[in-house]
Each structure stands twice: as structure tokens, then as C-alpha cells.
Amino acid sequence: MEFFSNNIFLFLILIISGLIYSRMTFGGMSSDVELINANGAVNLINSSPTVILDFRNPSEFDKARIALSVNLKKEDINSNNLNIKKIKKNKKILLIANSHFELYSIIKMLKDLNYQNIHVLQGGINSWISSDLPVENDST
């Protein structure tokens, strides 16, 4: 505890640097990837066919998910995966994940496979739920 109190300035710099790096890394993709809130996601889904890819762990996915979403692992993103191969390159894709850092690598992998119309649900499934939007679970 003494180390922390003696180096609080160092810890603040570390935290601020991490936040800036996170913002630059994820925010830097904003010209290519649209970050949308829950209502924007509803508009996206209702306006044209949208593939919803959920990269949370299976137990979280089983508890609450958006209807018709597909649960994948980051490792599933490759040109041989049937779930990925079925997605046409011009389809809109809505991504859901728990981590911005995980999303960064997922987006890069999808872009490497020539998917361009990528959207991210800001706040993940929690923002969807807090907007009182419907979810499915294994008991429904």
C-alpha cells in the first residue's frame, strides 16, 4: 500500500495512458467501423439484413442474446469456418463482445477476409438490455 501511495502519480499516468491508447486504437477505426448504440443497432437490423456475431463466452450468450445472433470465438474467424463463409462480403455485420481489445483483433481479422460493412454495439449486450430491448436465452 505504501508503494501505491508513494507512486500515485505514476499510477495515474499509467491509467491515463491506457485510456488514451484504448481510445486511439479503437477510435482510430471509427472511419471504417461504425460504433452504434442499442437504438442504432435496432435501426440497422430493421433497415436491411444484418448478421449479428456475438463473441462473448457461450455461458454468457446462453443467458442473454439478441435474436438470430451467432455465438463465435475469435478463433472461428477464418475463411474455412462455415459460419463465416456463409456471410456475403457486402452484408452488414453487427459485432458484440466484452472487450474493445478483443473487438480490435476481430475487426482486423474480418477486414482481412474482405468484410467491410462492420458495426459495433457500443456497450455490448448490457447496453441492449439496459435499453429494454428483447433478448433470448436458453429457457425461451
Each model region followed by its residue ranges:
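Rhodanese-like catalytic fold shared by cysteine-dependent sulfurtransferases
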Residues: M1-A38, S47-T50, P58-K92, N98-T140
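Basic phosphate/pyrophosphate-binding loop/patch that engages nucleotide-derived ligands
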Residues: A41
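Active-site flanking residues adjacent to catalytic metal/cofactor-binding acidic residues
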Residues: L53
